[in-house]
A protein has these predicted regions:
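Acidic, serine/proline-rich, intrinsically disordered low-complexity segments
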Residues: 1-24
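C-terminal output/effector regions of signal-responsive regulators
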Residues: 23-80, 93-97
Length: 136
């Protein structure tokens, strides 16, 4: 259902309705989190960040290095390079921190040092994955 929203090029409101009206799978939880952070699905970094968060949410996935374990896997999936994946995720993190106030970030992410200063890609993705794991 959520993939239909992307394939049909619908907007964030349609995405939210698709997420809200169905069972909350890990993929939908990540989509909702990114929606709540006002990151548009049109950003390439949206897809890449979503994949990275989902990889880290998998209890069986062990990540020792983003540059060796995460970015190359996502790059291969999308026919891109690790450098482009990292750059687009950084752009997405920048967008999130540009459009959200500290209060908005606290409302979505909770009280955490991550809401005060823009974190690195690794810190942001790791934090989001851990937040979603704890909400299970």
């Amino acid at each position: 259902m959520v993939s239909d929203v992307f394939n049909e090029g619908l907007d964030l409101t349609d995405l939210y309705k698709a997420i809200k009206g169905s069972e909350m799978t890990p993929e939908k939880k990540v989509s909702k989190l990114l929606y709540d952070l006002m990151l548009p699905p049109s950003y390439k970094g949206y897809r890449y960040m979503k994949d990275a968060i989902l990889m880290l949410c998998d209890d069986n996935y062990v990540c020792t290095s983003f540059t060796k374990n995460i970015y190359p896997v996502i790059a291969e999936k999308y026919g891109s390079t690790s450098q482009n994946i990292e750059k687009n995720i950084r752009s997405a993190v920048n967008k999130i921190y540009a459009v959200n106030s500290r209060e908005d970030l606290e409302k979505t992410l909770g009280k955490s040092p991550i809401i005060y200063d823009k974190p690195s890609n690794v810190k942001f993705i790791t934090f989001c994955a851990e937040k979603l794991r704890l909400e299970r």
